[in-house]
Design a protein with these regions (language model features):
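A diffuse structural propensity rather than consistent per-protein peaks
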Residues: 87-90, 132
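Transmembrane catalytic cores of multi-pass membrane glycosyltransferases
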Residues: 54, 58, 63, 102-178
Length: 178
């Protein structure tokens, strides 16, 4: 019980730190990220379960730490000008996106579903760039690599006799409407 309570504090701290880091990277104002994070922490805009779930130290809430970087790196990729698509920085951004997205799948399928919905929304927002052949090809290859990174260890373990995560079955049943 003590370990779960301690992990709760670490988990909540990292979720808020990742949120602050993403806002600092996306906002031009030096004060807006702090205000946004404080409003999220102190404001109670949704039901109490929205915030209390982070106290449970469940794997799906821990996976939320990696949803935010997935969103950030995808936005950064689409903000890159076409002339800079072949630079090392862009490859690093795509690599970080692949790692963050694959970690959501490796931890819990719940976070992957949220990250996937966010990615669909971002692609819709950057529709013209998303449909551009250069951007589309790069993001699709990165997406395939990120899923492969997460599924490969699970597949090896499954072949070795370890059953798959319960979250995969749950997530697929939610997607299929069951």
């Amino acid at each position: 019980y003590v370990i779960l309570c301690t992990f709760y504090l670490v988990q909540v701290f990292f979720i808020h730190t990742v949120l602050l880091a993403m806002l600092k990277l996306l906002c031009r104002s030096p004060y807006l990220p702090y205000a946004g994070t404080l409003i999220y922490i102190l404001g109670s805009f949704w039901t109490i379960q929205t915030y209390s779930r982070f106290g449970a130290s469940l794997p799906q809430e821990f996976g939320m730490i990696f949803v935010i970087p997935s969103v950030y790196f995808l936005i950064r990729f689409f903000q890159t000008e076409k002339e800079k698509l072949k630079t090392k920085e862009t490859k690093l951004i795509l690599g970080c996106f692949a790692l963050a997205f694959s970690l959501t799948l490796a931890i819990h399928f719940y976070g992957t579903m949220i990250a996937g919905l966010c990615c669909i929304g971002i692609a819709g927002g950057f529709c013209l760039r998303f449909l551009n052949r250069e951007y589309f090809r790069r993001i699709m290859i990165t997406g395939i690599i990120s899923v492969f990174l997460a599924v490969l260890p699970m597949g090896i373990a499954f072949v070795g006799g370890t059953p798959l995560q319960g979250s995969l079955g749950w997530g697929l049943s939610v997607i299929n409407g069951g």
